């Protein structure tokens, strides 16, 4: 790219500049295509890593200090959605989307479990503020997030990446959402449960 910039200084004619511009655009598109391919490749690898495998066992407390484990939800669909931080804008939006659709999740024989690295006290405040009807689990020892490999270092603190796992009634992971849109994620997961249930 630097060579093209140098050549454009030497090149005086309009035709020469147009040719250099075309070459520059071509190189940019090639780099974009390569990056896009890398993103899709990571997504496919992630699906292969988790789909079809048994979900890891866990035992975590919710916002009311009640314990939850994988085994107690056998026979139900489990939406295990990890989010970075209580009260952050994206996490608030995502939780509200699950709240709105929660009655439909119940009708679909599904339980929604939010998970972050915040503690029980933080979860309690967050849940009360939003009026959440479902459990949010405190993984403040990073036990579950580490099993899924989604702990992210953020300066001196750690957060869970915004990723979700859909677990079928037998305890098998059927989908891994590693790219989440907080506005539409809940609706997407609900649609997938209904699709997989047919």
Regions inferred by a protein language model and the residue ranges of each:
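N-terminal targeting signals for export/organelle localization
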Residues: 1-61
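Short active-site neighborhood of thiol/selenol oxidoreductases, capturing the structured segment around
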Residues: 71-93, 98
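Short loop/turn microsegments at loop-to-beta-strand junctions
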Residues: 55-56, 77, 161-163
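Structural microenvironment flanking redox-active thiols in thiol-disulfide oxidoreductases
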Residues: 92-132, 143-146
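A short beta-strand-turn-helix
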Residues: 58-77
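Thiol-/selenol-based redox modules, centered on thioredoxin-like
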Residues: 159-198
């Amino acid at each position: 790219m630097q060579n093209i910039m140098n050549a454009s200084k030497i090149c005086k004619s309009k035709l020469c500049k147009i040719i250099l511009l075309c070459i520059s655009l071509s190189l940019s598109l090639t780099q974009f295509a390569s990056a896009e391919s890398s993103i899709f490749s990571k997504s496919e690898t992630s699906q292969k890593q988790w789909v079809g495998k048994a979900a890891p066992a866990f035992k975590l407390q919710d916002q009311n200090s009640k314990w939850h484990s994988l085994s107690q939800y056998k026979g139900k669909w489990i939406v295990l959605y990890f989010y970075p931080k209580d009260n952050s804008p994206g996490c608030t939006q995502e939780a509200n989307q699950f709240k709105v659709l929660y009655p439909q999740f119940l009708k679909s024989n599904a339980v929604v479990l939010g998970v972050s690295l915040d503690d029980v006290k933080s979860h309690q405040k967050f849940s009360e503020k939003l009026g959440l009807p479902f459990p949010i689990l405190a993984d403040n020892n990073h036990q579950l997030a580490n099993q899924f490999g989604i702990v992210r270092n953020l300066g001196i603190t750690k957060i869970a990446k915004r990723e979700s796992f859909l677990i079928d009634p037998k305890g098998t992971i059927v989908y891994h959402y590693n790219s989440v849109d907080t506005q539409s994620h809940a609706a997407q997961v609900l649609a997938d449960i209904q699709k997989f249930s047919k």
